[in-house]
Swiss-Prot record:
Residues given in the record as substrate binding sites: 33, 59, 349
Protein name, as recorded: L-rhamnonate dehydratase
Cofactor(s) it depends on: Mg(2+)
Gene3D superfamilies in UniProt: Enolase-like C-terminal domain, Enolase-like, N-terminal domain
SMART domains linked to this entry: MR_MLE
Enzyme class (EC, first level): lyase
EC number: 4.2.1.90
Miscellaneous comment text of the record: Reaction proceeds via a syn dehydration.
Its biological purpose: Catalyzes the dehydration of L-rhamnonate to 2-keto-3-deoxy-L-rhamnonate (KDR).
Highest taxon in the source lineage: Bacteria
UniProt keyword terms in alphabetical order: Lyase, Magnesium, Metal-binding
Organism: Escherichia coli O1:K1 / APEC
CDD domains: MR_like_2
Family, as annotated: Belongs to the mandelate racemase/muconate lactonizing enzyme family. RhamD subfamily.
Amino acid sequence: MENIMTLPKIKQVRAWFTGGAIAEKGAGGGDYHDQGANHWIDDHIATPMSKYRDYEQSRQSFGINVLGTLVVEVEAENGQTGFAVSTAGEMGCFIVEKHLNRFIEGKCVSDIKLIHDQMLNATLYYSGSGGLVMNTISCVDLALWDLFGKVVGLPVYKLLGGAVRDEIQFYATGARPDLAKEMGFIGGKMPTHWGPHDGDAGIRKDAAMVADMREKCGEDFWLMLDCWMSQDVNYATKLAHACAPYNLKWIEECLPPQQYEGYRELKHNAPAGMMVTSGEHHGTLQSFRTLSETGIDIMQPDVGWCGGLTTLVEIAAIAKSRGQLVVPHGSSVYSHHAVITFTNTPFSEFLMTSPDCSTMRPQFDPILLNEPVPVNGRIHKSVLDKPGFGVELNRDCNLKRPYSH
């Protein structure tokens, strides 16, 4: 009889944070909205707060960067460690060290689904439909997958069953699709800058932006719009039709997460051939099931916010059963290892974090070391052939551990 590998138990879980409200602006890391001055990601992007003039110009003005980066590290009895990052900051540290630790420590490193289910059910009374608590659970889940991969000496994508393609092709999210085309990406997704409070003038301005980029990028390059929950059905419908002459591939997250009937109506109203997408700010498996039922074309969970890799795999199955694509909101290596195993993810997102979108910069810079970036718009599966998620924690990032147990 062949010997079966004996897996260690988890000795300890630890949580740090960096950045956030008490830090100097521009920490980056897991909270990639926390960028310095003159960055495209904070330049008059339409949001649900844009109707208030005091908060129209900058997303940081209403506090999009107050949470900061959460780092969760799990250590096995044999001394090996796994870690992950997300957006939950000091409050996430409290949840990990004072609540979730009891479900993690003492478990086998392979007990990921058991730990995941216990974390979800134990936080139901204060987690609601996602948000901070789900970000924290996601971070723990990703750290567990990282540890498991390192213990058995395999990349996470092989733990999920292996790659279904040799490489991942990417579109770029940022203010300059024309530069993204030069870098080899298959498409460019731009943020909208105007919303319902701006009336038809706002529609004309954003449509003119799309028209300008279509002229610069040519007919075959994908162009998309990211509306970041800032619209209503009527405005989104008018914007979609205004952009139809410029072959807009999809219009994304026009409505707040729970407006399921609105998404159903928008899909019905959208021009023929234009896709409707959403999911970035949905935080539970149940919400993705309901979102799928609206008939949208692509679901876009963030693996660091939706419940982690364990939930992302389940979301992909829901989408596949309905003939929908799942294209995760850009989350770097944590998405790469998943999407290369999904048959219904033919491409993925890369978020441009350089200030003017002119250079390639790792999304979670500087918190991750050895974080890969696309080359000519692609990442080959061989780049992912390292144990776990294949990245290391940069411990020079002023990490703080405010709680212990």
